[in-house]
Amino acid sequence: MSKVIVAGGGVIGLCAAYYLHKGGHEVVVIERGDIQTGTSFGNAGYVSPSHFIPLASPGIVAKGLQWMLSSSSPFYIKPRLDLDLIKWGLTFWRRSAKSHMEKNIPPLNEILHLSRALTSEIRDELGNHFRMEEVGCFMLYKSAVTEKHEIELAKEAAALGIETKIFDAKGVQEMEPEVEVNVRGGVLYPIDCHLHPGDLMQTIYQYLQSKGVQFHLNTTIEGFEKEGRKVSKVITDKGDFTADAFVLATGSWLPIVTKHLGIELLLQAGKGYSMTFENVEKNLHQPAILVDDRVAMTPMGTDLRMGGTMEISGLQSPMLIKRVQAIFKAAKNYYPNLPVSFPSSEKIWWGWRPLSPDGLPYIGRHSAFDNLVLSGGHAMLGLSLAAATGKLVEEIVGGKKTSMDITAFNVERYN
C-alpha cells in the first residue's frame, strides 16, 4: 500500500482522496483553507452532461468581445498588464477555433458521462445526504436568436446520444406551477442532475475521516523537496510531509503550487458569484440556466441558489457588487414573482474557477517527475467532472488502465 498526499480539499481533491482510499492507498489531504470555504462549496450544484461544448469556442469569443469590458456583463476581464494573462488569453483565442472545439467535444462528452454515472454510485454508496435530484436542467431563453442557437445545440446533443426535450413558453410554465416564468421557451436535458455541493463535500469528508484518512486543514504549501525524478516531500507552514506519490488538486492556486517544482501551467482564475435564499415559500421545481444572461438557478430542497458570471480579475480582486446585481436582475426578469429580495453583502458568496485555455481539465502525470499527478483547470465543470477525475487520478497513481483515453487532458499540452 502506497502513501499518497493529495494537495487540495475542494471537490476535485476530495474525490481523488475518495477513490485513492477505495484503491487501497494511505491518503493524506492538505488544504489551504477548510472544507467549506473553497470554490466548490457555493457553486450551482450541477452535474451536467449537457455542458459538452468546451469553454473555448467560437461563440464565447464572439460574445466575450462584447462583454469583456463591461463590469456588469456575464463575462469580464479586468484590463491589466499581466504576462500570464496575456499568454493565457492568446492561447484561449487560438483554441476557440471551430476545429479545436470539435476535436475537444468527444473527450469532454465522455468524461462528463463517466462522471455522471460515478456521481450516482457515490450517492448509492454513501447515501443521498447531499440532496441529489435527477430532474434534468432547463436551458431557458427569451430571444429568437438564442432559441435558434439552443435548438442547434440540442441537435448536436442528439448526435452525441444526449436526450433533449424542447418546450415552448406554455410548456415551460407547466413545469413551474409555483412561479411565473417569462421566457420564449427552453430545452430540457433530462440526464442532468443537481445536488448541494457543500453537503456532498461534507459527506465525502466525513466518510474519509471515518476511514482514517488524515486531513491537514488551514495548511499552506511553501515548497517541495526532490530526489532525482521523484518528489520526496512537501513543505508547509505546519511542517513537512513525505509520501510515495503526490496529487496536486489546488484549484485556481495550482500554477502557484506547481511553480515550486519548476512547472509552468497556463491557468487563470475566473471568479463566479452566488446567492442562496433559504426557505423560499414558492420555489422553482426545475434547475435552469438563463441562457441570455448566463445565470444558473438551482432549487435545493426549500432553498434556492442563483449564480453566474465569469470575472477574470486576479485572485486578490474584491467583490464587484454590479455583477451580483446583474445576476439578481436577470433572475427577476425570468421569474417576475419570485419571492426573494436582494441579499446583504455578507450573504453573497464568490469563488474562483480554474480555467485552462481550451476548457478541458489537466489530468495526468508530468514528465519531469515519476510520482506526481496534476488535476485542475476544470473551469465551470468542477462538480460535473469531480467523480470521474477522482477515478482517473486513482487509476493513474495505481498504474492501471484508465477508464477512458486521457490524451486530451495532457498536463503538458501547451509546452
Identify the meaning behind each predicted range:
Residues 1-10:
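Beta1/beta-strand and adjacent pyrophosphate-binding region of the FAD-binding site
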Residues 13-14:
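N-terminal Rossmann-fold NAD(P) dinucleotide-binding loop
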Residues 22-41:
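Glycine-rich FAD pyrophosphate-binding loop
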Residues 44-167:
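Dinucleotide-binding Rossmann-like beta1-alpha1 core, especially the glycine-rich loop
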Residues 45-46, 51, 55-95, 221-232, ...:
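Active-site substrate-recognition segment that forms the wall
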Residues 103-116, 139-149, 174, 187-206, ...:
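Short beta-strand to alpha-helix junction loop
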Residues 148-160, 179-244:
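Helical element adjacent to the flavin cofactor pocket in flavoenzyme catalytic cores
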Residues 164, 292, 332-415:
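C-terminal catalytic lobe of FAD-dependent flavoproteins
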